[in-house]
């Protein structure tokens, strides 16, 4: 039996539905399984809507070999960059759980540490950016990283967040569509 259930609660939608339709202002954005929506969002709206905490959406300058976030260049393949040849800025999407503490990587000024037992959430801004880096509907938000650590960094510390380039989503700023 097919049932259509309408909700504004993403957790409800993700747990109750075999397929979920994400709409924005009455326009269908993407229809897929909950996991596919999470893993391969079609655009910035779906990326920012699905997941709790939400995907980090960070704007950076296109440079040789990748996208510059704060004081670090996240590697992005030439094939992906070629899909947005005229764009000087792209938006990178990184899920909080995709980060690891590392000796090299994206610099984070830790503002808040939320300890949850086996995991901790770090909230902060990118090193070298002079601003909070995550964006959603044009508003700045803190970057969130979920780390598995018994000894998380402390508030005020500066850490490096490693990320596997395969887990980075790249979005066009012109179209808001995912290009990676």
For every predicted segment, state its role.
Residues 1-4, 10, 87-89, 111:
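Alpha-helical hydrophobic/aromatic positions enriched in membrane-embedded helices and signal peptides
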Residues 2, 7-75:
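Internal alpha/beta loop-helix hairpins
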Residues 53-55, 65-180:
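Non-catalytic connector elements of ABC transporters
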